[in-house]
Amino acid sequence: MAIITTDNKHYRNIAAAIREKTGDEATYTPEKMPAGVAEVYDAGKQDERKEFWNNALMSESDWTRRFAGSAWNDNTFRPTKDLKPKGGSFQMFSGCKITDLAGILRECGVTLDVSGEDWRVDDMFSSATLLTTVPYLDLRNASWGNSTLNGLFYGCTALHTIEGLHLNEDGNTTWGSSTFLNCTALENLTIYGQNGQNGLNLSWSTKLTHDSLMSVINALQDKSGTGTPWMVTLGSVNLAKLTDAEKAIATQKGWTLA
């Protein structure tokens, strides 16, 4: 029990209550009581936060719009355990006001593990206009017809870094028409796995680094000899960043760079 330097039973009871709530063993004087009460408040808020996140993340299926909308920002999005969506992640963060998603997850000591999602991830971050960074996303198991990644980052006008986008190793991950639509600030993009589908359009992202563009080219699946037209749209600004030899890596695999 906490100690107080007075025989006043009332203060002793308050000190005991503070210790019970905070786990502190400090000696409390009347002058220190306000600080102790503040500690109780903070401890209560922490308990409230943990209870909320445990309840919010209790469902193991259907993460549709779980963190969508303007109420989710850098202050309200403070997860206490790993996020492992499955059963559908359509518009999971759509329209949120979170900025540095990758940084917040690291600060909270948790991860966003999408590897178990075997259904929809389209529009997952759509219209999240303040979003600047996205962590590594393992999308190898995601599948939604011809538009698995459609609108994934649509309208993310502040997004400059995607730490990793892991496509299916067999090249079957489909893009849709607006995966990177209006991603005008995007600089850093790393592609893992193989891109074996038409539809990738990065022409809006004119700030992409050379390394990012080479990551896209190196991830192209070898389609040489298939007799089918295959195309990746990079746009004239991005094409100007590549040498003829680098472009040839794509063409030798049967791809046209537009």
Identify the role of each PLM range.
Residues M1-P79, P85-G87:
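Surface-exposed receptor/substrate recognition regions of extracellular proteins
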Residues N238-A258:
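Extracellular/surface-exposed low-complexity segments
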